[in-house]
Structure formats: C-alpha cells, structure tokens
Amino acid sequence: MAAHQPAKWIWTDNDFDAMGWHDATLWAMLADPERFEFLVDLDYIFEWVKPAPEETYYKFWIAPVTMIFENAHTVKLDIESSQGTIEVADLHRENPRPTPNGKLEERTYRFECQEGEISLLATGFQMIVRRNPALLSAQSLNLELREGVSFDRRPATQE
C-alpha cells in the first residue's frame, strides 16, 4: 500500500471541522506558563483502512503529533486509568466567547476520553505532524516507533 501523505504538516483551529480525534492515544501533556500554552503529545489517526476481502481487521495510518493550545488556561483533568493510558473518544470545541481583554475569542476545548475528561480554555491550536504516518494494525504507535515522548514543534518533511 502506498504511503499516506497528510494534506498538511501543520493543522490549526481553522481545520477543526475536517479533523477527528477518535481513538487517538494521548501520551503526555505539558503546561508552559511562560508562553501561555498547553501542549499534548498524541498519536493521531489520519485514516482507517478497511480490510481487504481476505482480511478481518482494519489498519490505521498513524503519526505522532504535537498539539499546542494557545493562550491556554483553566486546565481541568478528570482521568482515571488503570494502566495509565489515555484514549481519546473525541475533541469538542465549545462555548466561544471574548477573552477578558476583548481582543480575541476563546473556547473550551474538551477531550472526551475513555478514561475521563481533559478540558481547557484557549484561543486556538496548532497540530504539528512530527513524522510521516505509518500503516499499523494497532491504533497507536509504541514508544520505539514514535521515538519516545516529544513536544517537538518541527513538522516532518516528506521522506
């Protein structure tokens, strides 16, 4: 099967309606109070590949990404995971309103997860694709394939 090429290497809040986070694996989170950012390291599924006639299971085009939420604050975590893993069911973007200074619009971003919920207020996000997607039978990369946990802001280049 030919390699999957993402439509772009840096996605933004403007692309939200064309994106989907179902079954993404969340590996790590980081709050950067100096930049007013909240970063998430996750495995993003770009495409579900239907099984061929002689196959039973789906395959998945997956790449590690860094999500950077801008002007982020009021982060709330309500997670209970027996294995410490977090699987995203969906990402919701809700309640648009002006920022306190009235210069920007902020929203609630809410990760609905199998293990609970993560929410925050932010003015937008970037999602940076760090590597070319790999075709796998599992819905996430392992630590070796994804080269560990990372909040790298550099997009992949076509390999």
Predicted regions and their residues:
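Surface-exposed, interaction-prone regions used to assemble/regulate multi-protein complexes
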Residues: M1-E159
